[in-house]
A protein has these predicted regions:
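Anion (oxyanion) recognition and catalysis
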Residues: 3, 102-106, 136
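Active-site glycine-rich loop that binds ribose-phosphate moieties when present
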Residues: 60-68, 95-99, 126-131, 170-174
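Conserved phosphate/ATP/ADP-binding segment of small-molecule kinases
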Residues: 107, 121-182
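Hydrophobic beta-strand scaffold residues
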Residues: 9, 111-112, 143
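Active-site beta-loop-alpha junctions enriched in small/polar residues
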Residues: 54, 85, 116-120, 147-149
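Short, small-residue-enriched loops and turns at beta-alpha junctions
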Residues: 58-59, 88-89, 119-122, 151
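Surface-exposed amphipathic alpha-helices with a cationic face
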Residues: 98-105, 180
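Conserved N-terminal subdomain of the carbohydrate kinase-like
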Residues: 1-84
Length: 182
């Protein structure tokens, strides 16, 4: 369906159900695409989103599974981006993200990272901090808000809640300087 719609699938790793090779699953197809289901709220009942990522195929990718030389050397990709959801899906994806960012940096490729912390993906914030800080160390352009910097990396602003905006902004800028230095 992707190819029929004109989407370039050259870099997609296809998983098979023949139980042969590194990207294989059993005949039952226990690997699947991750899906999100959102229940619409009504009245005082808020909406709720459920994520089904437990057996998502991308969770199985790890270091060495993607031809990074082809991407960054042969094809000359100039911008590499990853995000906090992918990096926290599994220990393998975390290691792949670090490998990806390092390889991009070796080739002078601009590297960006969207913190995009989701507690439903990794509820252990200390674990998330450790993984994300390794990736941030390899990043040129970091995307996040105050909550992301706190939840994904463990950085807090020194401003008390309810302070004037200018005071909060100064404290936020100070926190960003610490993140950049670290």
């Amino acid at each position: 369906q992707l190819r029929e719609a004109g989407v370039d699938t050259t870099h997609i790793t296809w998983f098979s159900t023949d139980a042969k090779g590194p990207f294989s699953t059993d005949a039952k197809g226990t690997l699947m695409n991750g899906i999100n289901v959102t229940y619409r709220g009504k009245g005082v009942i808020p909406s709720k989103t459920e994520y089904y990522r437990a057996h998502t195929a991308v969770r199985e990718l790890g270091p060495g599974d993607v031809d990074l030389d082809k991407i960054f050397v042969s094809e000359g990709v100039r911008w590499a981006h990853t995000g906090g959801i992918f990096t926290l899906l599994s220990p393998k994806t975390a290691e792949l993200a670090v490998e990806f960012m390092k390889k991009a940096g070796e080739q002078g490729t601009l590297r960006s990272f969207d913190l995009n912390y989701r507690s439903k993906v990794e509820p252990d914030k200390q674990k998330a901090h450790g993984i994300n800080r390794r990736i941030v160390a390899e990043t040129d352009f970091l995307v996040g808000n105050q909550g992301d910097f706190s939840d994904a990396l463990g950085y807090e602003t020194a401003a008390e809640k309810g302070v004037p905006f200018e005071e909060w902004l100064d404290a936020y800028a100070d926190m960003l300087r610490v993140v950049a230095k670290d």
